[in-house]
Amino acid sequence: MMTFCKANTAYLLVLVALAFSSCNQKKDVSNGYNPLEVSVGLQKTMCYGSCPSFNFSVLNNGHATLTVGRFAEKAFGRHLNEGKYTGTIELHEISKITEFAEKSGYLKLEDRYDNPMVMDIPAAISTINRKTVFNRHEGPDLKDLYSRIEHLISTVDWVEKPDTEK
C-alpha cells in the first residue's frame, strides 16, 4: 500500500509541475506578426435631407471595404451603386492619412461629440489606428481629415460584392 501511495504522490507532483510550467509559457510575437485591425475608417450617417451616407474601412494590410448608402457621390465625386464593395489600398497611402491625423492631434480628441436632443445632423464616425471619434454635434472640425479619406476612397478600384455576399 505504501508503494502505491508513493507512486500516486510522485505522479501527482509531476502533473502539478507540468501544469505550472505550462502557465509560464509565453507566446513569441516578435516574429513580425501583426494582427489585422482597422487603420483608417470613416462612416457618415444619413440625415433627413440629402447627406451622403457610407461606411469605409481599410485594414493595416490594405484590404478595404466600403458600404455605399444614399447620396455617396457627393462625398467621393464618382458614382457607385448602393451596396458593398471591396478593394485594396497601398500601405503608403494609408500611412499618409494616419500620419496626418496623428500630427493634427486626432489621438488626443474625446471619443464622442454629440447631443441626443439634436436629430437632423449626420454623424461622422472616424477611426485612426484604434482611436474612434463619434462627431455629430459641437465637435472638432475634422473636415480636412474627412476630405483626405474621401479622396482616398475615390481613387480605389472598387469591386462590387454580388447580392449573395451582401
Residue ranges of model-derived segments:
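Short, well-ordered, aromatic-rich surface patches in folded extracellular/luminal domains
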Residues: A7, C23-Y48, F54, F100-K166
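Sec-dependent bacterial lipoprotein signal peptides
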Residues: M1-S21
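Short, solvent-exposed coil/turn segments
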Residues: L13, C51, L80-E82
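A short, structured loop/turn motif at beta-sheet edges
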Residues: V58-G62, G87-K96, I128-K131
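N-terminal secretory signal peptides
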Residues: S39-A75
